[in-house]
């Protein structure tokens, strides 16, 4: 059996789709999988069992689909985890016996993980028993990484791909890092030009205070990003793809929310995560930039609040 899967575009969505992917894998144990999608989503599932990875060419996706029609020949099942119209066209170009399309308007108030699971349950008329986040990577170490100086590791993730509205201030991240710098090594994570600027700003603030810090922005693959996050002792993050990676590995995480719905994108089943947010009338606006121009949902959320939540988390963690 040959199964074609159009993966979600964003890293966080791809992580949240992982239980649904493994439900398909469990139901069709001997199937061959073609995983198609963005650079980051395909990299996340590069080691998925019995799979062929194809990176989507956004500039000429339909021409690419026509080529894939010849290359892949007949496909038994196709699943689109994207609700975009382009995804529907691609699946109709391919020689597919049965096609299933994710509808983002169904189960609108449910967590994104459950939305994806319901999509597969309804498509295949089955009941999903696998609901844990899961990635196919085999990590190099079996126990938390301890550095030579004996310090634990604090990871900072100041970026968020959706837009600037989701990003806590770089100086706030730096203040949190300064508070834990005596007990923790500091690692900064990020990707892309916009996040590079944020990461560099945090790095410079900490270096000026003679704090030892490593800036890993744009210096990791998806696999090494997962590995580095997995062995953090504490992770401070915006609502983002790396936040969902930390949930896979049950990392102690303080997740900072502003314009997005934490009921739908919170760290899934991570009992070692705590959410920090305000309760403003304008929240959640679900906008890429603040429509009111003040960005109070993030600016009024001060570093001391996050520091206190992190301390409580370290005291009361399930790990």
Language-model segments: which ranges?
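Catalytic machinery of carbohydrate-active enzymes
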Residues: 1-319
């Amino acid at each position: 059996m040959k199964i074609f899967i159009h993966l979600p575009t964003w890293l966080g969505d791809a992580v949240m789709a992982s239980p649904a992917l493994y439900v398909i894998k469990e139901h069709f144990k001997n199937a061959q999988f073609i995983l198609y999608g963005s650079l980051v989503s395909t990299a996340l599932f590069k080691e998925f069992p019995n799979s062929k990875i194809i990176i989507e060419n956004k500039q000429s996706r339909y021409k690419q689909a026509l080529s894939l029609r010849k290359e892949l020949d007949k496909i038994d099942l196709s699943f689109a985890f994207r609700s975009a119209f382009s995804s529907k066209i691609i699946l109709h170009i391919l020689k597919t016996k049965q096609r299933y399309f994710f509808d983002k308007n169904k189960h609108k108030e449910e967590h994104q993980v459950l939305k994806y699971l319901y999509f597969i349950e309804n498509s295949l008329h089955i009941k999903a028993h696998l609901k844990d986040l899961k990635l196919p990577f085999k990590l190099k170490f079996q126990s938390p990484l301890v550095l030579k100086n004996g310090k634990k590791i604090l990871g900072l993730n100041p970026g968020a791909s959706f837009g600037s509205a989701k990003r806590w201030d770089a100086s706030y991240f730096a203040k949190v890092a300064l508070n834990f710098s005596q007990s923790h090594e500091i690692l900064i994570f990020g990707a892309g030009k916009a996040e590079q600027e944020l990461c560099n700003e945090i790095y410079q603030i900490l270096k000026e205070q003679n704090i030892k810090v490593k800036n890993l922005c744009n210096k990791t693959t998806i696999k090494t990003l997962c590995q580095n996050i997995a062995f953090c002792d504490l992770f401070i993050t915006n609502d983002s793809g790396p936040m969902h990676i930390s949930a896979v590995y049950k990392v102690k995480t303080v997740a900072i929310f502003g314009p997005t719905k934490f009921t739908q994108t919170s760290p899934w089943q991570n009992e070692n995560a705590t959410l920090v947010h305000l309760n403003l009338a304008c929240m959640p606006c679900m906008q890429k930039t603040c429509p009111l121009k003040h960005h109070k949902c993030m600016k009024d959320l001060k570093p001391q609040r996050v520091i206190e939540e992190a301390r409580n988390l370290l005291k009361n963690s399930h790990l």
